[in-house]
Amino acid sequence: VLNQRDELILREKYPFVGHTTRIPIALPDRGTSIQQTTELTRKKPTCLFLGSYFAPNNQGILWFVEHVLPYVDIHMKIVGRGMSKLKDESPALRDIEVVSDAPDLLPHLQDADIVVLPIFSGSGMKVKTCESLMYGKNIIGTPEAFEGYDIDYSLVGGNCKTAQDFIECIKNFTQNPRPRFNEYARKTYLQKYSLDAIKQSFKTIL
Protein backbone atom coordinates (compact mmCIF):
# COMPACT_ATOMS: atom_id res chain seq x y z
CA VAL A 1 0.00 0.00 0.00
CA LEU A 2 1.05 3.63 -0.48
CA ASN A 3 0.26 4.96 2.98
CA GLN A 4 -1.43 4.29 6.31
CA ARG A 5 -4.81 5.51 5.08
CA ASP A 6 -4.78 3.03 2.20
CA GLU A 7 -3.81 0.26 4.61
CA LEU A 8 -6.76 1.04 6.89
CA ILE A 9 -9.16 1.08 3.92
CA LEU A 10 -7.74 -2.24 2.69
CA ARG A 11 -8.16 -3.90 6.08
CA GLU A 12 -11.68 -2.54 6.47
CA LYS A 13 -12.75 -4.05 3.14
CA TYR A 14 -10.69 -7.24 3.45
CA PRO A 15 -10.26 -8.09 7.16
CA PHE A 16 -8.52 -11.37 6.30
CA VAL A 17 -5.51 -9.58 4.76
CA GLY A 18 -2.30 -10.48 6.57
CA HIS A 19 0.95 -8.52 6.64
CA THR A 20 1.18 -5.41 4.49
CA THR A 21 4.10 -3.17 3.59
CA ARG A 22 3.96 0.52 2.80
CA ILE A 23 5.85 1.48 -0.33
CA PRO A 24 5.30 5.15 -1.19
CA ILE A 25 4.99 6.75 -4.59
CA ALA A 26 8.18 7.19 -6.64
CA LEU A 27 9.08 9.01 -9.84
CA PRO A 28 12.07 8.86 -12.19
CA ASP A 29 14.36 11.79 -11.54
CA ARG A 30 13.81 14.70 -13.92
CA GLY A 31 14.78 17.30 -11.35
CA THR A 32 18.35 17.63 -12.57
CA SER A 33 17.04 19.77 -15.44
CA ILE A 34 15.94 22.62 -13.19
CA GLN A 35 18.30 25.46 -12.34
CA GLN A 36 19.28 25.29 -8.68
CA THR A 37 19.13 29.03 -8.22
CA THR A 38 20.20 30.85 -5.07
CA GLU A 39 17.70 33.64 -5.75
CA LEU A 40 15.19 34.37 -3.01
CA THR A 41 11.42 34.28 -3.38
CA ARG A 42 10.06 37.56 -4.70
CA LYS A 43 8.09 40.10 -2.68
CA LYS A 44 5.20 39.37 -5.02
CA PRO A 45 5.75 35.64 -5.44
CA THR A 46 4.57 33.60 -8.38
CA CYS A 47 2.36 30.84 -6.99
CA LEU A 48 1.92 27.92 -9.36
CA PHE A 49 -0.94 25.45 -9.34
CA LEU A 50 -0.19 22.34 -11.38
CA GLY A 51 -3.09 20.11 -12.27
CA SER A 52 -5.28 18.92 -15.11
CA TYR A 53 -9.01 19.53 -15.55
CA PHE A 54 -10.19 17.06 -12.92
CA ALA A 55 -12.84 17.46 -10.23
CA PRO A 56 -10.56 17.52 -7.12
CA ASN A 57 -8.17 19.93 -8.88
CA ASN A 58 -11.00 22.16 -10.05
CA GLN A 59 -12.57 22.22 -6.60
CA GLY A 60 -9.26 23.02 -4.95
CA ILE A 61 -8.11 25.86 -7.17
CA LEU A 62 -11.54 27.52 -7.26
CA TRP A 63 -11.63 27.39 -3.46
CA PHE A 64 -8.15 28.94 -3.32
CA VAL A 65 -9.10 31.72 -5.74
CA GLU A 66 -12.20 32.55 -3.72
CA HIS A 67 -10.90 32.23 -0.16
CA VAL A 68 -7.16 32.94 -0.33
CA LEU A 69 -6.22 34.94 -3.43
CA PRO A 70 -8.09 38.16 -2.49
CA TYR A 71 -6.05 38.43 0.71
CA VAL A 72 -2.51 37.94 -0.61
CA ASP A 73 -0.36 39.87 -3.08
CA ILE A 74 0.81 37.18 -5.49
CA HIS A 75 0.97 36.38 -9.18
CA MET A 76 -1.25 33.32 -9.61
CA LYS A 77 -0.58 30.90 -12.44
CA ILE A 78 -2.53 27.74 -13.28
CA VAL A 79 -0.90 25.18 -15.56
CA GLY A 80 -2.53 21.94 -16.60
CA ARG A 81 -4.10 19.91 -19.36
CA GLY A 82 -7.57 21.16 -20.21
CA MET A 83 -7.57 23.98 -17.65
CA SER A 84 -8.61 26.53 -20.27
CA LYS A 85 -12.02 24.84 -20.04
CA LEU A 86 -12.18 25.63 -16.33
CA LYS A 87 -11.28 29.24 -17.05
CA ASP A 88 -14.09 29.45 -19.62
CA GLU A 89 -16.52 28.00 -17.07
CA SER A 90 -15.43 30.11 -14.10
CA PRO A 91 -15.67 33.93 -14.06
CA ALA A 92 -13.44 33.90 -10.97
CA LEU A 93 -10.51 32.86 -13.18
CA ARG A 94 -11.04 35.62 -15.74
CA ASP A 95 -7.98 37.66 -14.71
CA ILE A 96 -5.74 34.73 -13.77
CA GLU A 97 -2.99 33.39 -16.02
CA VAL A 98 -4.00 29.92 -17.18
CA VAL A 99 -1.74 27.81 -19.39
CA SER A 100 -3.54 24.83 -20.84
CA ASP A 101 -1.80 21.86 -22.45
CA ALA A 102 1.72 23.24 -21.91
CA PRO A 103 4.24 21.25 -23.98
CA ASP A 104 6.84 21.59 -21.23
CA LEU A 105 6.20 22.20 -17.52
CA LEU A 106 9.82 22.98 -16.70
CA PRO A 107 9.76 26.73 -17.55
CA HIS A 108 6.71 27.20 -15.33
CA LEU A 109 8.27 25.27 -12.47
CA GLN A 110 11.51 27.19 -12.90
CA ASP A 111 9.69 30.51 -12.68
CA ALA A 112 7.55 29.62 -9.67
CA ASP A 113 8.44 30.82 -6.20
CA ILE A 114 5.89 28.52 -4.58
CA VAL A 115 3.78 25.56 -5.69
CA VAL A 116 0.34 25.68 -4.09
CA LEU A 117 -1.62 22.44 -3.70
CA PRO A 118 -5.09 23.16 -2.27
CA ILE A 119 -6.39 19.61 -2.68
CA PHE A 120 -9.20 18.36 -0.45
CA SER A 121 -10.16 14.94 -1.82
CA GLY A 122 -8.67 11.89 -3.43
CA SER A 123 -6.82 8.74 -2.47
CA GLY A 124 -3.30 7.41 -2.36
CA MET A 125 -0.49 9.95 -2.67
CA LYS A 126 -0.51 13.02 -4.89
CA VAL A 127 1.86 12.86 -7.88
CA LYS A 128 2.15 16.66 -8.09
CA THR A 129 3.52 16.73 -4.55
CA CYS A 130 6.22 14.27 -5.52
CA GLU A 131 7.00 16.22 -8.70
CA SER A 132 7.29 19.44 -6.72
CA LEU A 133 9.71 17.81 -4.29
CA MET A 134 11.69 16.41 -7.20
CA TYR A 135 12.15 19.88 -8.71
CA GLY A 136 13.09 21.42 -5.37
CA LYS A 137 10.10 23.71 -5.02
CA ASN A 138 8.66 25.44 -2.00
CA ILE A 139 5.30 23.76 -1.44
CA ILE A 140 2.24 25.03 0.40
CA GLY A 141 -0.54 22.46 0.49
CA THR A 142 -3.37 20.87 2.40
CA PRO A 143 -3.10 17.72 4.53
CA GLU A 144 -4.60 15.83 1.57
CA ALA A 145 -1.82 17.08 -0.72
CA PHE A 146 0.77 15.79 1.76
CA GLU A 147 -1.05 12.55 2.64
CA GLY A 148 1.52 9.76 2.95
CA TYR A 149 4.58 11.99 2.68
CA ASP A 150 7.18 11.95 5.44
CA ILE A 151 8.35 15.57 5.44
CA ASP A 152 8.93 18.57 7.67
CA TYR A 153 6.21 20.99 6.58
CA SER A 154 8.00 24.03 7.97
CA LEU A 155 11.04 23.28 5.81
CA VAL A 156 9.18 22.40 2.63
CA GLY A 157 6.74 25.32 2.85
CA GLY A 158 3.59 24.78 4.85
CA ASN A 159 0.73 22.42 5.69
CA CYS A 160 -2.49 24.43 5.59
CA LYS A 161 -5.85 23.26 6.89
CA THR A 162 -7.75 26.52 6.43
CA ALA A 163 -7.80 29.56 4.17
CA GLN A 164 -6.25 31.59 6.97
CA ASP A 165 -3.39 29.09 7.17
CA PHE A 166 -2.71 29.60 3.47
CA ILE A 167 -2.88 33.38 3.83
CA GLU A 168 -0.47 33.44 6.76
CA CYS A 169 1.93 31.01 5.12
CA ILE A 170 2.08 33.00 1.88
CA LYS A 171 2.52 36.27 3.78
CA ASN A 172 5.38 34.68 5.68
CA PHE A 173 7.11 34.02 2.37
CA THR A 174 6.63 37.62 1.26
CA GLN A 175 7.90 39.02 4.56
CA ASN A 176 10.70 36.49 5.04
CA PRO A 177 12.00 35.46 1.60
CA ARG A 178 13.46 31.99 1.21
CA PRO A 179 15.54 30.45 -1.59
CA ARG A 180 13.38 29.71 -4.61
CA PHE A 181 15.17 26.38 -4.92
CA ASN A 182 14.30 24.37 -1.83
CA GLU A 183 17.24 22.09 -1.10
CA TYR A 184 15.30 20.25 1.59
CA ALA A 185 12.51 19.37 -0.86
CA ARG A 186 14.99 18.06 -3.42
CA LYS A 187 16.90 16.08 -0.79
CA THR A 188 13.67 14.57 0.54
CA TYR A 189 12.73 13.40 -2.95
CA LEU A 190 16.13 11.79 -3.51
CA GLN A 191 16.17 10.05 -0.13
CA LYS A 192 12.57 8.85 -0.01
CA TYR A 193 10.66 9.15 -3.31
CA SER A 194 13.16 8.57 -6.10
CA LEU A 195 13.30 5.23 -7.92
CA ASP A 196 16.64 4.45 -6.27
CA ALA A 197 15.13 5.02 -2.84
CA ILE A 198 12.14 2.80 -3.56
CA LYS A 199 14.37 0.05 -4.96
CA GLN A 200 16.03 -0.10 -1.56
CA SER A 201 12.62 -0.41 0.09
CA PHE A 202 11.73 -3.34 -2.16
CA LYS A 203 15.04 -5.04 -1.39
CA THR A 204 14.23 -5.03 2.32
CA ILE A 205 10.99 -6.98 1.79
CA LEU A 206 12.16 -9.47 -0.84
Describe these PLM feature segments:
Residues M125, G141-P143, K161:
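Conserved acidic donor-binding loop of glycosyltransferase catalytic domains
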Residues S154-Q164, K171-R178:
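Conserved acidic donor-binding segment of nucleotide-sugar-dependent glycosyltransferases
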Residues P177-L206:
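A charged, aromatic-enriched C-terminal amphipathic alpha-helix characteristic of glycosyltransferases
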Residues P143-N159:
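Short acidic/histidine- and often glycine-rich active-site loop of Leloir-type glycosyltransferases
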Residues E12, T21-D111:
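Conserved catalytic-core segment of nucleotide-activated headgroup transferases in glycan assembly
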